[in-house]
């Protein structure tokens, strides 16, 4: 097996990323697919690694979807769901504000996720400009998962984003993330999600206003197991067997 990761930049800013965990004989086809994925870039990096140890996750998080009239209502729903699992409104508000304004201390977005203490709201990631990236995750049979999502009524426009985001969220919860809030930094894509072990993966629209270039991820995590969690998110290679 091989881990293949793509990262694209434009004017020094991260604009696209994707990855696969695949048999070696699919390498050429998958690399070509990843090269075509960014719309615009002036730098693209493809990283290919041999996989020595592979773990499996039996099933993905269950998927639900909610559409709201505006961002305010969507964020109120996020606050409500996270409060149900013990995260206070003030902490969730801080996370939402970070993603709305841009979580990078120097302004704008980060390549990785914010790690946030769910009690104090303190940021825990070692590098607040880089964040923590969930990598080395894919589906055992990506084609079958796509077809299953199509049969559930997921439109083609959302399909690639959903299949990647669901894989990341599933690995996050498997590694020990308590809950996640995420939306894209793509100015034209307003759908985001929240995820946890308790309520699964909930797609939410709109999580931000149209034409807004900020976004990212906040992971609520336990301070006590931080290093073990980071190692799991960034280094362990995993495949998800089935869609729940």
From Swiss-Prot:
Keyword Ribonucleoprotein: no
Pfam family, one: BioW
TM region(s), chain numbering: none
InterPro entries linked to this entry: BioW (IPR005499)
Reported cofactor(s): Mg(2+)
GO biological process: biotin biosynthetic process
Signal peptide positions on this chain: none
Pathway(s) of this molecule: Metabolic intermediate metabolism; pimeloyl-CoA biosynthesis; pimeloyl-CoA from pimelate: step 1/1
Subunit details: Homodimer.
NCBIfam families the record matches: bioW, PRK01322.1
Function: Catalyzes the transformation of pimelate into pimeloyl-CoA with concomitant hydrolysis of ATP to AMP.
UniProt name for this protein: 6-carboxyhexanoate--CoA ligase
Organism for this UniProt entry: Hydrogenobacter thermophilus (strain DSM 6534 / IAM 12695 / TK-6)
């Amino acid at each position: 097996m091989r881990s293949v990761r793509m990262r694209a930049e434009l004017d020094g800013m991260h604009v696209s990323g994707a990855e696969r965990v695949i048999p070696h004989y699919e390498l050429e086809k998958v690399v070509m697919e990843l090269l075509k994925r960014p719309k615009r870039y002036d730098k693209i990096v493809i990283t290919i690694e041999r996989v020595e140890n592979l773990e499996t996750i039996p099933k993905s998080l269950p998927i639900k979807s909610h559409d709201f009239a505006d961002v305010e209502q969507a964020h109120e729903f996020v606050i409500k769901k996270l409060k149900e699992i013990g995260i206070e409104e003030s902490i969730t508000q801080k996370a939402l504000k970070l993603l709305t304004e841009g979580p990078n201390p120097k302004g704008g977005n980060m390549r990785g996720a914010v790690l946030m203490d769910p009690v104090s709201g303190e940021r825990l990631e070692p590098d607040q400009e880089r964040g923590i990236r969930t990598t080395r995750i894919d589906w055992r049979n990506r084609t079958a998962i796509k077809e299953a999502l199509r049969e559930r009524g997921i439109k083609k426009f959302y399909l690639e984003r959903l299949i990647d985001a669901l894989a990341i969220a599933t690995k996050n919860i498997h590694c020990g993330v308590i809950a996640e809030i995420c939306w894209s930094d793509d100015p034209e894509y307003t759908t985001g999600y929240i995820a946890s072990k308790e309520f699964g993966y909930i797609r939410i629209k709109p999580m931000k206003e149209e034409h807004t270039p900020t976004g990212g991820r906040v992971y609520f995590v336990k301070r006590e197991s931080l290093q073990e969690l980071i190692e799991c998110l960034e280094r362990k290679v995993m495949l998800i067997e089935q869609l729940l």
